[in-house]
Amino acid sequence: MSNTKRKLNKLLKEGDQIVWVTCYDSSFSIILDKVGVDIVLVGDSLGMVIKGEENTHSVTMNNILYHVSNVAKNKKNFILMADMPKNSYKDFKTASRNAKELLKNKVDIVKIEYRDDNRETLEKL
């Protein structure tokens, strides 16, 4: 069992609330780690929050990876989760390559939106 699974199982067994926060930069990740946040998400919501777009559709893997690298620099205790943005998992080969890239950059959990048209890809992953 991975450290991430062990930590999540422990949190669930203890019955405490899991504290999960979205973060996009190094300075806030330091604070979140110090105050004991359990899970930090680098989400595709950065399209709206950081880039000022109306939705998340313009977010690329490079955008996510940039913010993941900033957040991961200070990761000591929290579980790092990252979204795979739209079009980063359009087929198994693309999804696999992008998920591996996130994992190489200290991401513990890769978050992918389920849709009927990507079910087969998700099952393979």
Which sequence ranges carry the predicted segments?
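Glycine/small-residue-rich loop that forms an oxyanion/phosphate-binding "nest" at active or ligand-binding sites
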Residues: 63, 67-68, 72-114
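Conserved, mostly hydrophobic/aromatic
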Residues: 21, 25, 32, 71, ...
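Glycine-rich, proline-tolerant flexible connector loops at the mouths of alpha/beta enzymes
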Residues: 28-29, 35, 39-65, 86-89, ...
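Conserved phosphate-coordination/catalytic loops
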Residues: 2, 23, 58-62
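Structural motif
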Residues: 17-20, 37-40, 78-81, 108-109
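N-terminal amphipathic alpha-helix/helix-capping segment at the start of soluble metabolic enzymes
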Residues: 1-22
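Generic structural signal for hydrophobic
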Residues: 11, 32, 71, 102-103, ...
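Short, basic, glycine/proline-bearing loop/turn elements
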Residues: 11-18, 53, 102, 106-108
